[in-house]
Regions:
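C-terminal nucleotide
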Residues: 1-93, 104-133
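Conserved glycine-rich beta-strand-loop-beta hairpin in the small C-terminal domain of fold type I
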Residues: 101
Length: 133
């Protein structure tokens, strides 16, 4: 795993308020998106149990897309996520309450994790950490 700090403090309270407003404005869209996030979570649990890192990475990527649809991502987080993908991450997504905070990326091996870490820093991450799982 590679974890990157965006340098932006997360804004959970604001993110929750934005999603609540979006749910009032576009209830069908928000319900579909929330259902898709729930399905990603179930499938991610299965991928973890089966040791399927490729599927887990794909689901992380989908999850980030859905979080972006809920408007809890930021251009800075999106840039860090994109840099991880381009550097070969199996998947990447924001983590935490949204509107700042950290990004988590999944690498298939240690060398790749270092390349992903460098790419994330070049994309604006203040600090990165790698962790074997």
């Amino acid at each position: 795993l590679v974890i990157a700090d965006s340098g932006q403090a997360g804004q959970t309270k604001r993110a929750v308020a934005q999603v609540a407003q979006l749910a009032q404005d576009r209830p069908d869209q928000v319900m579909k998106t929330m259902a898709a996030i729930g399905e990603c979570t179930i499938q991610a649990q299965q991928a973890i149990r089966q040791g399927d890192l490729v599927a887990l990475g794909r689901l992380m990527t989908y999850n980030h897309y859905y979080l972006n649809q809920l408007k809890v991502s930021t251009p800075e987080l999106d840039s860090i996520v994109k840099s991880a993908w381009l550097a070969g991450a199996l998947g990447a997504k924001l983590t935490g309450g949204g509107l700042g905070g950290c990004v988590i990326a999944l690498a298939s091996q240690a060398q790749q994790a270092e390349a992903i870490s460098q790419a994330m820093r070049q994309a604006g991450a203040g600090r990165t950490w790698t962790m074997a799982i």
